From Swiss-Prot:
Belongs to the universal ribosomal protein uS9 family. Keywords: Ribonucleoprotein, Ribosomal protein. GO terms for cellular component: cytosolic small ribosomal subunit; extracellular matrix. GO terms for molecular function: RNA binding; structural constituent of ribosome. This is Small ribosomal subunit protein uS9. Pfam families: Ribosomal_S9. The lineage of its organism: Eukaryota, Amoebozoa, Evosea, Eumycetozoa, Dictyostelia. The gene is rps16.
Amino acid sequence: MSAVAPQKNVVQTHGKKRTAVAVAYATNGKGLIKVNGVPLEFIQPKNLKLKVYEPVLIVGKDVFSQVDIRVRVRGGGSVAQIYAIRQAIAKSIVAYHQKYVDEESKNEIKKKILDYDRSLLVADPRRCEPKKFGGRGARARFQKSYR
């Protein structure tokens, strides 16, 4: 006889900042949050660690106590990755509560997050403008000489 494993409730969300993309998987668990297999305590750079903790501090640790979140991040620089991670974590907790808990708690969590910082749930659409010919950058032109 084989024992039936408990069902895993999984939600996948993503956060983006410039070219950094973070994909978060929220499952029912004990409140672990890992980024590329490393716990949040060991995130580098140290001065931006608090930015990653913002979704946890805003919503409260009790909400995260029954959810495990695994985040994979790639692309971009260290600051862009931090912002992509925090967005993915915030979106995953909202999506998890919408799908597996109840609508009322989801709305409460979403309101708390939006009151604090809208960029935790809504991606920044600004991207780098491509370089064009006739100059050194996207808008800068080579100097013109009349003689």
